[in-house]
UniProtKB/Swiss-Prot annotation:
<feature type="domain" description="TRUD">
    <location>
        <begin position="151"/>
        <end position="332"/>
    </location>
</feature>
<dbReference type="GO" id="GO:0003723">
    <property type="term" value="F:RNA binding"/>
</dbReference>
<dbReference type="Pfam" id="PF01142">
    <property type="entry name" value="TruD"/>
</dbReference>
<dbReference type="GO" id="GO:0031119">
    <property type="term" value="P:tRNA pseudouridine synthesis"/>
</dbReference>
<dbReference type="InterPro" id="IPR042214">
    <property type="entry name" value="TruD_catalytic"/>
</dbReference>
<keyword id="KW-0413">Isomerase</keyword>
<keyword id="KW-0819">tRNA processing</keyword>
<dbReference type="GO" id="GO:0160150">
    <property type="term" value="F:tRNA pseudouridine(13) synthase activity"/>
</dbReference>
<comment type="similarity">
    <text>Belongs to the pseudouridine synthase TruD family.</text>
</comment>
<dbReference type="InterPro" id="IPR020103">
    <property type="entry name" value="PsdUridine_synth_cat_dom_sf"/>
</dbReference>
<dbReference type="GO" id="GO:0005829">
    <property type="term" value="C:cytosol"/>
</dbReference>
<feature type="active site" description="Nucleophile">
    <location>
        <position position="76"/>
    </location>
</feature>
<dbReference type="InterPro" id="IPR020119">
    <property type="entry name" value="PsdUridine_synth_TruD_CS"/>
</dbReference>
<dbReference type="InterPro" id="IPR011760">
    <property type="entry name" value="PsdUridine_synth_TruD_insert"/>
</dbReference>
<dbReference type="InterPro" id="IPR050170">
    <property type="entry name" value="TruD_pseudoU_synthase"/>
</dbReference>
<protein>
    <recommendedName>
        <fullName>tRNA pseudouridine synthase D</fullName>
        <ecNumber>5.4.99.27</ecNumber>
    </recommendedName>
</protein>
<comment type="function">
    <text>Responsible for synthesis of pseudouridine from uracil-13 in transfer RNAs.</text>
</comment>
Length: 360
């Protein structure tokens, strides 16, 4: 699917091919490790291999079962990545003998708990863009300023949808009963891709509505949107680009509980201050849906036949520590930034480029 971009600048020309030299990811833990406890915490560097391949190699050499290795999240294959894993400290001596050409243990400490999925604040990224002209470097500088000030949409990246980008279609067929999948792990993966696809469609729709509200008058919108003028006025008065709708579900930022948006004006001020952010639906069971006007939009991107657990996901995020430097001699533009967990650096790159970057 072609997602809708938040910014309206013309496409920026650069070359990006993901590799350990151009793409570095460093995991930021959710909490500091205590230095004491029965769990060995290991900072691991890997390149050109998946997290699963890394875990398999450690399991085989150290003698620990994969299910007994804790990790917070999966990291890119075609990259240089740093992440933390945990295993019982009885494996420490065996781990010290571990050797692999693509994996290196950087540091060791201890903690009382095992690392669990999702136990990370986010990730720091370093990205090198190539074949960047001076005029395009200046454009990138301007885009980074906007993204740091205003944030960006939290789309799922192309990696979520498989090599051919059609995993969501297979997941939809499973939900519809048109396809059987015996492998439970693969079945969940495909349905998750379908949930993510619906989220991306909804987010594009909300960006489209926000663009309309930012660009047209009340008179023009009253003829286009089936909304009372009072609602249009309330929406247009909001400072953020991305408009909150009555009945939206928001969440404290960068983490916290979800809550229903009742005071649209007040909550939009908190959103502008980066204290909260709206959320979108990942359809599934035991998941809260929006109310009112927000639900009128959301329902077109819901599928109540999905039997997997659903969730709410930030629709909008605020990149931090954004830095860019242009190396004219090499025609490189190097940027670094922090994103919260579950957010995609490639989505930020595509927002900068104003085009798809997969396959370059």
């Amino acid at each position: 699917m072609d997602r809708l971009f938040f910014l309206d600048h013309s496409p920026i020309d650069f070359y990006f091919k993901q590799s350990p030299e151009t793409f570095v990811v460093e995991e930021v833990p959710l909490y500091p490790f205590s230095g004491a406890g029965e769990h060995l915490i290991v900072k691991v560097r890997k390149k050109n291999m998946t997290t699963w391949q890394m875990l398999q190699s450690i399991s085989e050499q150290v003698g620990v079962k994969i299910r007994d290795i804790g990790y917070a999240g999966l990291k890119d294959k075609n990259a240089l990545t740093y992440q933390y894993i945990s295993l019982h400290k009885k494996y420490e001596e065996a781990l010290k003998k571990f050797s692999h050409p693509l994996i290196k243990t950087i540091e060791l400490t201890y903690h009382k708990n095992k690392i669990r999925r999702g136990h990370l604040k986010g990730n720091r990224f370093f990205i090198r863009l190539k074949k960047v002209k001076p005029v395009d470097a200046k454009k990138i500088d301007e885009v980074l300023k906007i993204l740091e000030e205003e944030g960006m949409p939290n789309f799922f990246g192309y990696q979520r949808f498989g090599i051919d980008g059609d995993n969501w279609q297979l997941g939809k067929e499973i939900v519809e009963g048109k396809r059987k999948e015996r492998n439970k792990t693969l079945k969940k993966l495909l349905i998750n891709a379908y949930q993510s696809h619906l989220f991306n469609l909804w987010l594009s729709k909300r960006i489209e509505l926000s663009k309309l509200l930012n660009c047209f008058t009340q008179n023009e919108l009253s003829q286009t949107l089936d909304l009372p003028r009072s609602i249009i006025k309330e929406l247009q008065c909001q400072k953020p680009f991305f408009k909150l709708f009555p009945g939206d579900i928001a969440m404290h930022y960068p983490n916290g509980k979800i809550f229903g948006v009742e005071d649209v004006k007040g909550e939009s001020e908190r959103f502008f201050a980066k204290a909260i952010a709206p959320t979108g639906l990942l359809p599934g069971v035991k998941t809260k849906r929006c109310d009112g006007l927000a639900r009128d939009i959301e329902k077109d991107y819901d599928d109540e036949r999905i039997s997997e657990f659903g969730d709410r996901r930030y629709a909008w995020i605020f990149p931090q520590e954004l830095h860019g430097i242009y190396k004219e001699k090499n025609a490189w533009y190097e940027l670094s930034f922090f994103l919260p967990k579950g957010s995609y650096a490639t989505v930020l790159l595509e927002e900068i480029a104003h085009r798809k970057i997969k396959g370059e």
